[in-house]
Amino acid sequence: MAILEQPYLDLINKIMIEGHDKNDRTGTGTRSYFGAQMRFDLSKGFPILTTKKVPFGLIKSELLWFLRGDTNIRFLLEHKNHIWDEWAFKNWVNSDEYTGPDMTDFGLRSQSDPEFNKIYQAELKKFDRRILDDENFAKKYGNLGDVYGAQWRHWQKRDGSFIDQIENVIEQIKNNPDSRRMIVTAWNPEDVPTSALPPCHVMFQFYVVDGKISVQLYQRSGDMFLGVPFNIASYALLLNMIARETGLQVGEFIHTLGDAHIYSNHFSQVKEMLSRKPYESPQLWLNPEKKHIEDFDMQDIKLVDYKHHGTIKAPVAV
């Protein structure tokens, strides 16, 4: 057993001490560090944080959503996952059809104005309910555009046909494991202007040696307190699922970040997290009857012995 989150704790502490204070797209402000790397040996356990509770169910449903090639939040809402709500809601309130209360800068205003936050939460709840109840509304306003699911599984070529990058990379791993081209990318410059949020985890590459498979992720932008813990667990889970399908043992997850940042309104939460003593990392259980990534459902993926400290809440910068 091991404490696999230590590289994350070391990096977030380094950013607090050595990072540069910068402005950002959301208007919140960040403390930022450029060019960082963390390594996690997945043969020793599963690298989910224990210094705060990380909701593994949300990570599972989001990854399954990506792997389905889905880009509509309806699937997520059906699994009580609200990670992407704000991005779809932003499209709705900026549309000509929206006639409700003014939602300009709802992300920042909801943090500083309690009365507005009540109005915002009520509108967001109505929006989610309508996505679930109204299929046509969901098709129009629940779709986030060319986000991860589309790029991973339906990359559009110039001739109008599509590339399934996940299927292709699995075939490469099986048939040519020494290839240096086992890459999946989500960054398409043509789609950046129309995407709800241009991909943060831009590309990942697989590497096979001695019967073990590793993956390295390049992430252009990482919200260290809220987003990155999800990304670590998500790619660790993805690697385990790919290892299952290809008959390999898991090796390392290597996480390389461009702009690794802590939002200024997360500083106190980070300090609280760093004051806690981490527990040993849990183990991942995958249903042994499932051999292919498309076969996995929520109940086929579990954590064993996940002991953790309490939740630390923090606002999302949109």
Curated annotation (Swiss-Prot):
Metabolic or biological pathway, per its Swiss-Prot or TrEMBL entry: Pyrimidine metabolism; dTTP biosynthesis
Catalyses which reaction(s): dUMP + (6R)-5,10-methylene-5,6,7,8-tetrahydrofolate = 7,8-dihydrofolate + dTMP
Disulfide bonds listed in the record: none
Keyword terms, alphabetized: Cytoplasm, Methyltransferase, Nucleotide biosynthesis, Transferase
Class of enzymatic activity (EC top level): transferase
Record-linked SUPFAM superfamilies: Thymidylate synthase/dCMP hydroxymethylase
Entries under InterPro entries matching the protein: Thymidate_synth/dCMP_Mease, Thymidate_synth/dCMP_Mease_dom, Thymidate_synth/dCMP_Mease_sf, Thymidylate_synthase, Thymidylate_synthase_AS
Binding site for dUMP: 25, 180-181, 220-223, 231, 261-263
Domain of life from the UniProt record: Bacteria
GO cellular component: cytosol
Broad class of where this protein is predominantly found: cytoplasm
EC number in record: 2.1.1.45
Pfam families: Thymidylat_synt
Swiss-Prot/TrEMBL GO biological process terms: dTMP biosynthetic process; dTTP biosynthetic process; methylation
UniProt GO MF annotations: thymidylate synthase activity
Binding site for (6R)-5,10-methylene-5,6,7,8-tetrahydrofolate: 223, 317
Family annotation (HAMAP family): Thymidy_synth_bact
UniProt family annotation: Belongs to the thymidylate synthase family. Bacterial-type ThyA subfamily.
Subunit comment: Homodimer.
Function: Catalyzes the reductive methylation of 2'-deoxyuridine-5'-monophosphate (dUMP) to 2'-deoxythymidine-5'-monophosphate (dTMP) while utilizing 5,10-methylenetetrahydrofolate (mTHF) as the methyl donor and reductant in the reaction, yielding dihydrofolate (DHF) as a by-product. This enzymatic reaction provides an intracellular de novo source of dTMP, an essential precursor for DNA biosynthesis.
PANTHER family membership: THYMIDYLATE SYNTHASE, THYMIDYLATE SYNTHASE 1
Name assigned to this protein: Thymidylate synthase
The organism of origin for this protein: Lactobacillus acidophilus (strain ATCC 700396 / NCK56 / N2 / NCFM)
Underlying gene: thyA
